[in-house]
Amino acid sequence: MNDKIVRATAKNGMVRIIGGITTNLVNEGSKIHECTPVAAAALGRMLTAGTLMGTTLKGEKESLTLKINGGGEAKGITITAHNDASVKGFIGNPYVTRELNDKGKLDVGGAIGKDGLLYVIKDLGLKEPYVGQVPIYSGEIAEDFAYYFTVSEQTPSAVSLGVLVDKDLSIKAAGGFIVQMMPDADELLADLVTYRLEEIPPITTLISEGKTIEEILEFIFEGMDLNILDSIEPSYKCDCSREKVEKALASIGKKDLQEIYDDGKNEEIVCNFCNTKYSFTTNDIGELLKNSIKK
């Protein structure tokens, strides 16, 4: 089944929904970073949140960065997303291992930790990016984003993010949704939506059963005039290039470049997001140095 993100409304626009299946995307990210099961679950939840939230951006030059670091052994996760539902990310320690939590589930909250902040950074092409931050609520990620939306954006929200890791470490199912109540929605509607969300099986169970994201949302919002607005296929996509790496290397300054050149060793730079290796010979460093001196 292909991954898909849909945007929808229910109850005449009183409920706003973004939902998606992200199994292939999360599998790609987990493979790139060679994640353990708990690392794959943590990274996958963040990637899913990123691709869902990225679709709310208006322009293709806008970007969204999500960061969470609670002092746990995962050593933080960073995600960057765009409005075409493309996303990339990295986890500080992809080899983190934890015992299962008291519910018999992967202990994402323990791996992330609670002693830190969740950051949401929106670069909308203005002079300064918008930066929202909240204390980490549980480290389970979905609850942390629900807390962020409610506290920082004053939008009561329910967030579900799930990743099911198979025995061979591939991703069996991944997906999630963000459900937000509009300001004019009445409390009875909010209570009904909350009740429905509490009663449904985990989203990974529904995906594993072969349900599409449309079928999942129709199941949740049955009798509530669900209206699917649009859909898009998400992807794990890194936009790194040798040219960008050269610019980053040149930006460290002439003094540091000169030291690297004087060492006479080849330099290798690895992209955090996709692990692509970029090699620079002494001659390459010399050219960068020469160009920086000209400037």
Curated annotation (Swiss-Prot):
| Record-level GO cellular component terms | cytoplasm
GO BP annotations of the record are: protein refolding
Q: Does the UniProt entry include the keyword Repeat?
A: no
Output the Gene3D superfamilies linked to this UniProt entry: Hsp33 domain, HSP33 redox switch-like
Look up keyword Zinc and say if it applies. Answer: yes
Q: Which InterPro entries match?
A: Heat_shock_Hsp33 (IPR000397), Heat_shock_Hsp33_C (IPR016154), Heat_shock_Hsp33_N (IPR016153)
Single GO molecular function:
unfolded protein binding
UniProt keywords, alphabetically: Chaperone, Cytoplasm, Disulfide bond, Redox-active center, Zinc
Where does the protein end up? Cytoplasm
Q: Which cysteines are joined by disulfide bonds?
A: 238-240, 271-274
Q: Name one Pfam family in it.
A: HSP33
- Could you state what the record's PTM comment says about this protein? Under oxidizing conditions two disulfide bonds are formed involving the reactive cysteines. Under reducing conditions zinc is bound to the reactive cysteines and the protein is inactive.
Superkingdom: Bacteria
What job does the chain carry out?
Redox regulated molecular chaperone. Protects both thermally unfolding and oxidatively damaged proteins from irreversible aggregation. Plays an important role in the bacterial defense system toward oxidative stress.
Report the family membership.
Answer: Belongs to the HSP33 family.
The protein's name is 33 kDa chaperonin
